[in-house]
Design a protein with these regions (language model features):
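Interfacial transmembrane-helix termini
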Residues: 20-37, 52-54, 67-91, 102-111, ...
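Transmembrane signal-anchor hairpin modules in multi-pass inner-membrane enzymes, especially those
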Residues: 1-83, 100-110, 114-117, 172-185, ...
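Long extracytoplasmic/lumenal interhelical loops at the membrane interface
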Residues: 142, 280-347
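A membrane-periplasm/extracellular boundary helix in multi-pass inner-membrane enzymes
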Residues: 125, 200-201, 221-283, 297-305, ...
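Alpha-helical transmembrane segments of multi-pass inner-membrane proteins
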Residues: 17-20, 93, 110-143, 150-226, ...
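Transmembrane alpha-helices of multi-pass inner-membrane enzymes
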Residues: 36-42, 171, 214-215, 358, ...
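Membrane-embedded alpha-helical segments of multi-pass membrane proteins
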Residues: 15, 25-47, 85-97, 157-167, ...
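Loop-to-helix entry and N-terminal half of a specific, functionally important transmembrane alpha helix
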Residues: 11-19, 57-66, 186-192, 334, ...
Length: 444
């Protein structure tokens, strides 16, 4: 029986290790594995009658968020997403389940980070092949001439994937034992490969978020030994990006010409198509594009009728076609492509204040660590790395996915498990111990 339980625990740990893989190839199995892990975690907690793992501020934070979503849903007219909203608590379970396994499986962190490292290399070479030949390793065509998607196929989120998981590479670099020289070199190489993948993806939002993230880390890495290469890294990014834009008409058009036209050229075909003439005359420039400006006007019309608790979570797609809200036939989409605007529309002032306070807390923790650094006091690099992730992902003036999208929610909540894990360790560096060759098939 003990052998069976050990095997079961290892299989469940393997599911956690495979999460970055299933973020790419199967959202169904991504959620399925997380549900199995969470169910197993809850069975263990109930059997042992030990609920101390839930004694975190995150529990209060998530409970507040969950109650807010329920209230917004109950007072809304749209009831299409009742199952999705009721089961939203599962994301908190995912966090605590992963935290539990991190604390109880000695080498899980090592396996997880090594898996991620291998994935970054595979995605880099696959992206190059797709960019050069038009097909990737498994025959998937390039999405557009300027949109390399690798294994994501017709879903252009490769850049978003790299940006969201890039901080884990930095965590790996921070905590890896310095004696693992080969692994250290490979991590550094993957860090340098990352902006190339993001750039080839053609995702302008991901490129901006990556630059913003690097600027954030630049303030904290100036006094750290393991990240002394950060200055050379910034120069490398600027020179390589500039050189590529200069030599590629396709990417210059994507990143420069299209961006300038979508924001400042009222006569651009796309801008005239998305906004009625009376709305075009109101703007000297567009926030991101005329299409997004349309969503803003439509969203604000919805908000005016649902100020306190909004129109309900995930409701924009259902209410945007209402004649009282839309400004033309192009006013509808599945979401409004901005977390803050989505919070304001779908959860009202209460939800908007909630996300604002969350972001202010991130800034507060960041400033606290920065002051510690200036005074020469100890501060947690791993905490700073994760704060940098949320500082950029919740940056207000960006085009985003839906905050309630399952894939997006998983990726947004995942770092919290690691944040709580490192917080409990109360140390700057966790030297990964290399397991025996029989057990570790991933360590280099």
């Amino acid at each position: 029986m003990d052998n069976f339980l050990k095997l079961k625990f290892r299989v469940e740990s393997l599911m956690i290790v495979s999460l970055p893989i299933f973020m790419i190839i199967s959202r169904f199995f991504l959620e399925f594995f997380l549900l199995i892990i969470s169910f197993s975690f809850m069975v263990r907690v109930i059997k042992k009658n030990n609920y101390t793992i839930f004694k975190e501020y995150f529990s209060l934070f998530f409970l507040s968020l969950y109650v807010l979503l329920l209230l917004s849903f109950l007072f809304s007219d749209e009831k299409m997403n009742i199952i999705s909203i009721l089961l939203y608590f599962r994301f908190a379970l995912y966090v605590f389940a992963i935290l539990y396994f991190l604390k109880n499986e000695e080498h899980l962190l090592n396996y997880f980070l090594n898996t991620l490292l291998v994935l970054f290399f595979i995605l880099f070479f696959d992206s190059l092949i797709q960019y050069i030949y038009g097909y990737n390793l498994i025959g998937l065509k390039i999405f557009e001439t300027h949109r390399v998607t690798s294994f994501f196929g017709d879903e252009p989120i490769l850049g978003s994937y790299i940006v969201k998981l890039f901080p884990f590479l930095l965590i790996f670099k921070e905590i890896i034992n310095k004696n693992f020289k080969k692994t250290n070199y490979l991590i550094t190489l993957a860090i340098f490969f990352s902006p190339i993948i993001i750039f080839l993806s053609g995702e302008r939002s991901s490129v901006v978020l990556f630059f913003l993230m690097i600027c954030y880390y630049l303030f904290f890495f100036i006094k750290t030994k393991k990240f002394k290469f950060i200055y050379f890294y910034v120069v490398f990014i600027i020179l390589s990006t500039g050189t590529f834009l200069y030599n590629s008409d396709v990417y210059y058009d994507r990143y420069i010409t299209q961006t300038m036209n979508s924001m400042f050229d009222k006569e651009a075909r796309g801008n005239k198509f998305f906004l009625p003439k009376e709305y075009q005359d109101k703007n000297n420039f567009y926030l991101l594009s005329a299409q997004h400006q349309n969503f803003i006007y439509t969203g604000l019309n919805i908000f005016k009728e649902n100020k306190l608790l909004g129109s309900g979570p995930k409701s924009f797609r259902y209410v945007c076609d209402n004649d009282n809200y839309k400004i033309n036939e192009m006013s509808c989409n599945t979401h409004v492509h901005n977390y803050y605007l989505q919070a304001l529309i779908e959860t009202g002032l209460v939800g908007f204040v909630f996300i604002i306070l969350t972001y202010l807390y991130i800034i507060y923790r960041s400033l606290k660590n920065f002051i510690k650094m200036l005074k020469g006091k100890f501060f947690s690099i791993t905490e700073v790395i994760i704060l940098g992730f949320y500082f950029t992902q919740l940056w207000p003036l960006m085009q985003t996915g839906s905050i309630f999208n399952n894939w997006n929610s998983i990726v947004l909540f995942l770092p919290i498990a690691f944040f709580l894990f490192f917080k409990e360790k109360k140390m700057k560096s966790i030297n990964l111990v290399k397991p025996s060759k029989k057990k570790n098939i991933l360590c280099f």
